[in-house]
Amino acid sequence: MSTGQEARRDEGDSRKEQEASLRDRAHLSQQRQLKQATQFLHKDSADLLPLDSLKRLGTSKDLQPHSVIQRRLVEGNQRRLQGESPLLQALIRGHDSSRTSATQVPALLVNCKCQDQMLRVAVDTGTQHNQISAGCLRRLGLGKRVPKAPGGDVAPEPPTQVEQLELELGQETVACSAQVVDVDSPEFCLGLQTLLSLKLATSLSASSLLPSALGIPTESICDSEALVPHSLLSLPKCTTKSLTEKDLQQMGSRLHPGCRGQSYLLPPLA
């Protein structure tokens, strides 16, 4: 009787040992599979990275392949959202258009002389003072020369404003001042202050600039658009009047076809 009980007890112990060994093997196998899966994910992510990003991985989590990929995906989404934003695109287009309009050449140019050199002077009443480009100032040799070192060479330095600048407009010599700007074109710009002091008038029918009783021919560089920008006709104490075909016939003026039907600023009638 005791021998049978001992045999059954031994059989139960051996069965428990087998079950324990099976559980241990299953646990080890599961850990091994998880480790292999993690290594496979890291290896698969590392294949997407360039070689220079794999040289210094170290132990930091930010430098691991999956962290680098996640960070690049977030940056790419931000760039894509910014690129698809209509507000941002409108701001970019507005900035580009303002930049191109700032460097746009005016419609009326006159030829004059300064320092025995020919200049192309732009007529623009949108600016109060005269303006001269830094490149034109260097070409005329009007830049101040200051020493770079106590015993060194001298180099031209453009001032912020030029006084007593003599311009030969037709048969008249005009002494005026001009502000120095970093714009290459136009070389020189006649502002509203000089135009009013000299009592200059712009004749659209004759395409000429009239100081006093002397006519100076101008050069028109616009094609099929408006002949004169709005700023050229914006004079103080003016009233707004819409020009029609009947008004043009009564005035006897010839206007470019692209300018008809638009509003311009005209001096008040007496």
Curated annotation (Swiss-Prot):
Compartments where found: Nucleus
Domain of life from the UniProt record: Eukaryota
Region (Interaction with NR1F2): 61-99
GO cellular component, one term: cytoplasm
Keyword terms, alphabetized: Nucleus, Transcription, Transcription regulation
GO MF annotation: an example: aspartic-type endopeptidase activity
Region (Disordered) residue spans: 1-33
UniProt note on tissues of expression: Expression is restricted to the central nervous system (neurons in the dentate gyrus of the hippocampus, the amygdala, thalamic and hypothalamic regions).
Primary localisation category: nucleus
Biological process, per Gene Ontology: negative regulation of transcription by RNA polymerase II; Notch signaling pathway; proteolysis
Database matches in InterPro entries: Peptidase_aspartic_dom_sf
Motif LXXLL motif boundaries: 192-196
Biased composition (Basic and acidic residues): 1-27
Record function comment: Down-regulates transcriptional activation by nuclear receptors, such as NR1F2.
SUBUNIT field: Interacts with NR1F2, RARA and THRB in a ligand-dependent manner.
Protein name: Nuclear receptor-interacting protein 2
Biological source species: Mus musculus
